[in-house]
Structure formats: C-alpha cells, structure tokens
Amino acid sequence: MSGTFNDIRRRKKEEGSPTAGITERHENKSLSSIDKREQTLKPQLESCCPLATPFERRLQTLAVAWHTSSFVLFSIFTLFAISTPALWVLAIPYMIYFFFDRSPATGEVVNRYSLRFRSLPIWKWYCDYFPISLIKTVNLKPTFTLSKNKRVNEKNYKIRLWPTKYSINLKSNSTIDYRNQECTGPTYLFGYHPHGIGALGAFGAFATEGCNYSKIFPGIPISLMTLVTQFHIPLYRDYLLALGISSVSRKNALRTLSKNQSICIVVGGARESLLSSTNGTQLILNKRKGFIKLAIQTGNINLVPVFAFGEVDCYNVLSTKKDSVLGKMQLWFKENFGFTIPIFYARGLFNYDFGLLPFRAPINVVVGRPIYVEKKITNPPDDVVNHFHDLYIAELKRLYYENREKYGVPDAELKIVG
C-alpha cells in the first residue's frame, strides 16, 4: 500500500479544489523560518477538503456517501428498531411482511417502481458528483407509446437556506403507470460493462433519473438487476424496489420481462470486479451466456450493449495473484456468498488521500445499437445462443473502439479474458 498516499494522478482528478497548486515549491533559498514552516505543512493540508468547497459539491459528496453506506445504515436502523420496545408496534408487522413478501424474486418490481422516488434531488447530486452522463448512439423504439397528456411533466422548485447565498434546487417528475398503457414496441435487455467497484454508473444511469433516463429513453421502464443477497436486509430491500432495482435471478428476470419491463444486467459480475484497473479494460464475457438465453426465451426483445467509460477509474484496486492467500480467500468468498470483496481505496468524506468514497472520475455511459431477437424459444439450442452471443460481442467491441478516443482512452485495448 505504499502507493496509497502518493497517487498524485488520482488527486489531480479530484474536486478541482482551491487548494490546487498548494504544494508548489519555492525556489527562493532565503525563505524565512515562518515560510519554511508553512511549506512543511502544505503537503499535509493538500489532502484535506477546503472549507471553501462550494455548498453544491458538499451535497454531491453527501449523496454519494449515502449511496455507498446505505445498506449499512439500513442494517443499523433495523437492529435499533428490533431492540427498542417502543418501536415493536411497527417492527413486528413489518418483519412479518418482510418474511412473506417475495416481490424481489417474482417480477413484482413493476408494481413497486416509483418514478417520483427515482427523481429525488439526491440522485441528481449523485450523478453530478462524478459526473455520470448517459449517451445514446441510436434512438430506441419505445415499449410504450405515451400520449402527450401522459408524458413526464417536470416541476422545478428552489429552497432558500440560511445564509441566503445557499439554495437547493429541486425537481419533481409526475408518475406514470405503465401498467395502464398499451405495449407498442419491444422490451430491452441492456448489458452493462464493465462492472468496476459497485457498478456506480449503472446505478446512476438506470436506477435513478439523475441522468434523465426517462427523457433520453421515453416509454422504456427499466429495472436494474442486482444480487439477491441485497434483498435480505429489511427496509433496504424496499428502498431498492422503489428505485426499480430487483433480483438478478433467472426466474425474476423472465417475469419482469414478461410484464414489459426492460432490464439492465451488469454482465461481468463479482469476478469482473477483481479485474478493475486503470491500465486497461478486462471483461468477463466469453462464458456469460445466461443473459443471451433470457433474451431468446423472452422473444420480441432487443439486446443492447452498454459501455461505461470511466467506471474503472472511480477506485484504485490492489491486484492479487490467484495463487496468493488473499486471492484464494477472494475466490472462496465469491463461491460461497455469490460476491467477492476486492481490495480497493479512493478518497474519504473530508480528505482526498484515502477512504471508501469513489473519486470524482467522469463516467460516460454509452448505449449501443440494439440486436433484435424476434422469435421466442423456450429451450434455445447452443448454436442459436452462440449466434446472438457473437453478435453481442461484435457490437460491444464496435461501441468501444468507436468511442474510446472521444472519452479519453485512445490507446486502451478491450480484453475479454473469461
């Protein structure tokens, strides 16, 4: 970890803070003792967030801190509610509901999806932190065609704080009940690459309206899929469902698609998170054919590759060898718990040197061309699966190489390693 506190390249991407340039060395050798003492302190101060940080940037940092720690906070609150007799009148009925409700695994996310919740200001702050941008390369045919009086209506609000120079801009979107709309087009299965640490871009682009998803792809309601273990935390699972996030199990994915709700799957999974590196992009894709089978078993669906430039720049990941003790522990954890824990670091809440908050690295989520799967086949043969898998990889590579120079990685190669 000797490079932990010396990652100057990373720190230059941070904040654009007023402290930039604070470590410039004075060439004048006749410095006074006071100047020398100040110069000694400057490298230490560089890592701290300045008090002059704009209020809006503080809100962005808090939004990201909430997202990265929300599952822990919900867990703590649940334990507090269970251990507090005064709250049992609420905790007991909820826990009964929690044990019997199967919404995350039965496609019921369609009924729990809330555009109003996805449009809360916190998600705009979250996306502006990096920032995250959602870019479409072609227009996608809407699954639902909305009449003008059914379109998303946006209202803007401004709340003045004290002192008056601070204010919070709020946006509120009207809700749309797609269940009462006529389906006029295909559904979509978006494959998101690369996984990175936490798929931060996928959350901002497809689980919230922070990137204006409903305006960029109108009439295509979407559910981001994640590990079923995330729904084992009380309250947190309802929070995820309100954002349209659901379990990535095959049964749930098929049921969600059958209800004309498109889905987004982070294809590389837990194993790919171990490959996160700023030196290039490595994907786990050759053996990932389950999502292709889902599309064929659904029919009238488009496979759409999505590449997020900058996803792997949000954290520094310490590489481990497969034969090392740590590498074996990571693989064991993945095999037994369904996910793994990469060794990573970035910045903290009040400093830029070390912590678990991601860096402010731009994430450009570029959506490729759709690959239409017309015919529904309940048990697709291998040659059909391989055919669409090859088409998908070809489109993903085209998407990457046509856009890599535009988004700052002109020489980085795309490697499919597993």
UniProtKB/Swiss-Prot annotation:
GO process annotations (BP): ceramide metabolic process; glycerol metabolic process; intracellular triglyceride homeostasis; lipid storage; triglyceride biosynthetic process
Source species, domain of life: Eukaryota
Pfam families for this protein: DAGAT (PF03982)
Organism field: Saccharomyces cerevisiae (strain ATCC 204508 / S288c)
Function in brief: Catalyzes the terminal and only committed step in triacylglycerol (TAG) synthesis by using diacylglycerol (DAG) and fatty acyl-CoA as substrates. Required for storage lipid synthesis. Major DAG esterifying enzyme in stationary phase when TAG production is particularly active. Involved in lipid particle synthesis from the endoplasmic reticulum, promoting localized TAG production at discrete ER subdomains, and in ergosterol biosynthesis. Also has monoacylglycerol acyltransferase (MGAT) activity, catalyzing the acyl-CoA-dependent esterification of monoacylglycerol to diacylglycerol.
Enzyme class of the recorded protein, top EC level: transferase
Effect of residue 193 to A: Almost complete loss of enzyme activity
Name of the protein in its database record: Diacylglycerol O-acyltransferase 1
Enzyme Commission code: 2.3.1.20, 2.3.1.22
